[in-house]
Amino acid sequence: FKPSASDFSLSADSIGNRWLQEPVVRPNGFPLYHWIQTERGEGLLTLEGQELLLKPGDGVLIAPHVPHEYRENDGSGMWFTSFLTFDGKLSDDLYKICAVSPYLFVPASEGAWFQEWIDRIIDSHFLKNDIDDATLSVGCFEFLTRLSQLRTGLSRTEHPLYLQYVRPAMQEIESHLSD
């Protein structure tokens, strides 16, 4: 689904799961940071002259405007993915958060959390209709902080970005839940 546009510092521009992935060729890349993760099947991602095999659970965050292409790779014709693109006032500064240039690969051993996050957000939107723009924005910071944590080794709640952005936002949301 495509969440509503907002004035938040960070939000999801598009998000999806259980997506039967068609071949994609982007000679000029994509204009936003783009997460893609294999749910089922196997994909082949080509970027910067490198081929990355995306097995179930593997995911990758691709920086904006990085030429890339991806397609199903295991011969089944059935490559299912989840995806997330980021937008908002801080979207151009995500390289500072994730230190991604031009991509960050996440192996299946670390990927389950990201899949569960996407499933949870989609479930909250479609089945419960209980996610608002503020909650989605906080969730996007959480998602990116978790990615950044893979590079730094800090726990999620110790990460400086969590302390600076997520904790205050969560406190603000919690203080207004009864409103």
Q: Can you say where each PLM-predicted feature lies in the sequence?
A:
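N-terminal regulatory/effector-sensing and dimerization cores
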Residues: 7-101, 133
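Basic, amphipathic alpha-helical hairpins
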Residues: 120-131, 144-156, 168-179
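Short, solvent-exposed positions on alpha-helices
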Residues: 130-138
